[in-house]
Amino acid sequence: MTSVSLVTGAAGFIGSNLVEHLLDQGHSVVCVDNESANNEKFHWSHENGMVINVKVDITDYKGMKNIMSGVDYVFHLAAESRLQSAIMNPIEAVKKNCVGTTVMLQCAREAGVKRFVYSSTSSGYGNNPYPNVETQPDDCLNPYSASKIAGEKFCKMYRDLYGLETVVFRYFNVFGNRSPARGQYAPVIGIFQRQKDAGLSLIHI
């Protein structure tokens, strides 16, 4: 029987690559995104029987509850991930990253989802010395990292209190297909690769 995976933030850089991988593995995928970020649109057609695209906000409990039925696995990537936006509007960051994550956890719990996979951030390590390890204390220096690490705490609580299996990944510098090419949020590794491809030195001083 085909597994059904729900991916939030499916129109984004990491989410869209994850959807492709899940499809390659034979999963049916429910793609969730509000398409609010610049240049983020669904990459798959409704005509493909393995994909369903749903434009809905993760803070919409009723909307999320309606599409969670029959889902086996949830990959929760949707978030306010832009640092400057979170600093300028911390209330909105908390709404998306804390409330949105709690809505997703509750809907997953009610639907009997087998596993909930949460995408967090290495920003939670803050000024901890390198190399970073899981046993280091959290050191959240801005609303983005604070709200994302709060999401981790909710994942742990839903596991301990309700028995929902949760997994947390803290991403560092992610790069790949459809990653931002330029601007504040372009991965530094991608920038180095473009410099190399253009025959330029990797760092200009």
Segments the model singles out, each with a brief description of its role:
Residues 1-174, 196:
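N-terminal Rossmann-like NAD(P)+-binding domain of SDR-like oxidoreductases, especially those catalyzing
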Residues 149, 174-190, 198-200:
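Glycine/proline-rich active-site loop of Rossmann-fold NAD(P)-dependent oxidoreductases
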